[in-house]
Regions:
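Short, Φ-rich (hydrophobic/aromatic) sequence segments
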Residues: 63, 67-74, 93, 212, ...
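Short, low-complexity Pro/Thr/Gly
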Residues: 183-396
């Protein structure tokens, strides 16, 4: 039978709102299945089919049609109930084990901080978590709050010039010139790591990323007051990518250990959601003590091996200092919970004063308050595994909570807090009558295009030494995990056995399917990048390291470069993919990505990834 009743399709555009009724999709799928099954039964058992009226000429007998409809009604209701109940099991499981697969990705943008000039500078580092506000958004004039995700090191530098030129010997040189400020405080400056943001459209920014991370051959420095401005080689200086690793995570995480374990998967999710996050590089190794007194200019000459990918051009506007990603998250107290003796699950709602567009993102704390004594009793998160039980049943807290994201009655995502613990174990017990929940929230329910039009220009926290702030990129729209279908089961299968099942079946379709789990944007450009993977195969090699022999599995991936925004975009995709396939490494073998660009094009062997940490 050709009909697949496990994947109900939309009914035809007829009748009473067929496109809007979910139940009709199940009902029509069951009816199609029953009719086709009836035809097969009539062919295989003609006498039995004749007795029940299934082979009568002309229209099908009313009794047969009514039987079909009654059976389809019951089974479609049952199937819809099962499909509706499955997320109640799978969604909390995903949120607990792999939280990045089930949480909203709030709006993101790149923020630039402009330091104060004309006064004595206070050497400072701006910590992550500082808040900035947007201009009024939407018809109600909602102001969105963003927070910085990384620390910003303020340095006495201004970008004066940037560009590429050809030397007399035919080598391409990138020149970065900075103004040195506040020379009276030069001795306390630390210029050993200068962070640069590569600003521009995707082909330009990714081409600069590829140049700085792959093609640097040597770095020299010129200072007008030193040796009459002659070039001084600095072999110890390097340029490193600054957008990778758990320390560069865009969103807050529950546990640092789990964040490190899931770094490869979260990096792929960040790549599709906000690629600008990877357009940061660090100029490392410059010694500020070598700057002579009174120097006002610092110029770096970077010799690269080949031409800039795509022959893109750039200027000082493409090299920015003091930038960081910011995310639309704010802390607030949710509406108080009034527990009763019958329920354990309570929805978490933002206060009315925050606006109707605010939705909870994560729970920070849950506290019960005794109204008679004003004494507070904190709840422990079940994710910390400190709830009462086992050998520590006499020492653990009496209260714990579990927060999860579920699909509400209206189809929107809602946060639910489950209260439990030893004090709640007895039937009918009500240990607390007033519970407050502190949450992280975002403006995810704003009209989606309204966020794209906002500007982030107003500091809401103290930015020491900063004159003004503004966003360099348009804020992204919030992204939600895919709903419906088999997304939850695909995620569970993806992480099953630490990816060994996926590796054993690895081919182009499997890899494309794995990457599609991390693309929530529905963007045609991202879809083309995934579809550009044409073939995948595995081979094995051994490598002798000292007295041991390492076994290495090579994941060979062939891509079509036309699916990307230039050679630089291919380079960034390769770096992210190399990190991602490292998830398949285990204690029996290491994993290496080998990337082939087109037919007869260049190939690149990436460093192999070796399993570290626990056995599981």
């Amino acid at each position: 039978m050709s009909e697949d009743k496990n994947n109900p399709t939309k009914p035809a555009e007829s009748g009473f709102g067929a496109d809007d009724d979910r139940y009709l999709r199940y009902f029509d799928a069951e009816m199609r299945y029953l009719r086709e099954a009836g035809r097969e039964f009539a062919r295989s058992q003609p006498q039995g089919a004749r007795r029940v009226g299934m082979t009568m000429p002309g229209a099908r007998h009313d009794s047969v049609e009514q039987t079909y409809e009654g059976f389809a009604f019951l089974t479609s209701r049952l199937r819809m109930k099962l499909d509706d109940a499955a997320p109640e099991i799978t969604d909390p499981l995903l949120d607990h084990l792999w939280p990045h697969t089930g949480r909203t990705i709030p709006s993101l943008t790149i923020l630039e901080c402009v330091p104060r000039t004309g006064e004595a500078r206070i050497l400072d580092t701006l910590p992550p978590g500082l808040q900035v506000r947007s201009t009024p958004v939407g018809p109600d004039g909602t102001i969105c709050v963003y927070r910085t995700t990384r620390a910003i090191h303020l340095l006495p530098l201004n970008v004066r010039e940037a560009g590429a030129r050809m030397r007399e010997d035919g080598r391409t040189v990138i020149r970065l010139a900075f103004d040195l400020l506040h020379r009276e405080q030069r001795l306390v400056d630390d210029l050993s790591r200068i962070r640069l943001y590569l600003h521009g459209d995707r082909p330009t920014a990714s081409a600069l990323y590829a140049v700085f991370t792959r093609q640097v051959e040597s770095i020299g420095v010129r200072m007008p007051r030193l040796l009459d401005g002659q070039l001084q080689p600095r072999p110890a200086m390097t340029i490193e990518a600054a957008g990778f690793g758990a320390q560069a995570r865009l969103w807050p995480t529950d546990l640092d250990v789990r964040d490190v374990d899931l770094d490869r998967e979260q990096t792929m999710l960040e790549y599709f959601a906000f690629p600008e996050k990877f357009h940061f590089v660090d100029l490392c190794g410059f010694d500020a003590a070598s700057v002579p007194p009174g120097e006002t200019r610092l110029e770096f000459e970077i010799v690269i091996r080949d031409r800039i990918p795509g022959d893109v051009t750039f200027c000082a506007d493409n090299i920015r200092l003091f930038c960081t990603p910011v995310i639309n998250l704010l802390e607030l107290d949710a509406q108080a919970i009034r527990p009763n003796a019958h329920d354990r699950d309570y929805p978490v709602h933002a206060p009315a004063s925050a606006g109707e567009h605010v939705e909870p993102y994560d729970v920070l704390s849950v506290v019960a308050t005794d109204p008679r004594t004003a004494r507070q009793y904190p709840y422990q998160s079940i994710k910390a595994f400190r709830h009462r039980g086992g050998m520590i049943r006499h020492e653990s807290p009496d209260r714990y909570y579990h927060a999860s994201i579920r699909q509400g009655v209206t189809g929107q995502r809602e946060m639910v807090v489950t209260l439990g613990g030893h004090l709640w174990a007895e039937p009918g017990s009500l240990p607390d009558g007033h519970v407050t929940v502190r949450v992280l929230a975002n403006n995810g329910r704003l009209p989606r295009m309204a966020l794209r039009e906002s500007m982030v220009t107003t500091p809401a926290s103290t930015f020491n030494g900063v004159e003004r702030v503004h966003n360099l990129t348009a804020p992204t729209m919030p992204l939600y995990p895919p709903r419906g279908g088999d997304y939850d089961w695909r995620v569970i299968s993806h992480f099953n056995g630490a990816g060994t099942t996926e590796l054993n079946m690895m081919d182009a379709n499997v890899l494309r399917g794995a990457l599609s789990l991390y693309d929530w944007t529905r963007d045609d450009d991202n879809r083309r990048r995934i579809d550009a993977i044409h073939y995948v195969w595995l081979d094995e090699e051994t490598e002798r390291v000292g007295a041991r022999v390492d076994r290495i599995v090579n994941v060979n991936v062939g891509i079509e470069p036309s699916g990307f925004a230039g050679p630089g975009d291919v380079a960034l995709f390769g770096d992210v993919l190399s990190r991602f396939v490292g998830r398949y490494a285990c204690f029996h073998f290491a994993v290496r990505l080998v990337l082939y660009e087109g037919v007869g094009g260049p190939s690149r062997r990436y460093p192999c990834t070796i399993k570290t940490g626990d056995w599981l």
